[in-house]
Amino acid sequence: MKTFTAKPETVKRDWYVVDADGKTLGRLATEVARRLRGKHKAEYTPHVDTGDYIIIVNAEKVAVTGNKRSDKIYYHHTGHIGGIKQATFEEMIARRPERVIEIAVKGMLPKGPLGRAMYRKLKVYAGSEHNHAAQQPQVLDI
């Protein structure tokens, strides 16, 4: 019996919506990354994108444990000399709450073209509304 290998054109992708209200950031991100990769499916193949689409709502209400709300620091570089910037978790939530979840999930995905394709299937919204009703997403309880 030959080993089954998924083919990109035959992969069936579902849409799921996840409510981040009160969920712990890391625990939410690990499950979302797992589903974006497709590791929850029996036909998972490492070199093929077999994952589903994930919509995350209420990103502004995501929780972190301990003192991370004030102590966790996000860094990025502008590209100019001395252009390192930093922001705490509180500042990030106030400015761009969806970016916090995007950064957490992106770090858990493979680096390279396949990982970027998986990351593009993630849709994050700060509030409770999203514009993907036409895809009829199923509610995913994490």
Swiss-Prot record:
Keywords for this protein: Ribonucleoprotein, Ribosomal protein
Pfam families in UniProt: Ribosomal_L13 (PF00572)
One Gene Ontology cellular component annotation held by this UniProt entry: cytosolic large ribosomal subunit
HAMAP family recorded: Ribosomal_uL13 (MF_01366)
This protein's name: Large ribosomal subunit protein uL13
Gene Ontology terms describing biological process: negative regulation of translation; translation
NCBIfam families listed in its UniProt record: rplM_bact
Physiological role: This protein is one of the early assembly proteins of the 50S ribosomal subunit, although it is not seen to bind rRNA by itself. It is important during the early stages of 50S assembly.
MF term (GO), any: mRNA binding
Subunit structure: Part of the 50S ribosomal subunit.
Presence of keyword Transcription regulation: no
Family the entry assigns: Belongs to the universal ribosomal protein uL13 family.
Record carries keyword Ribosomal protein: yes
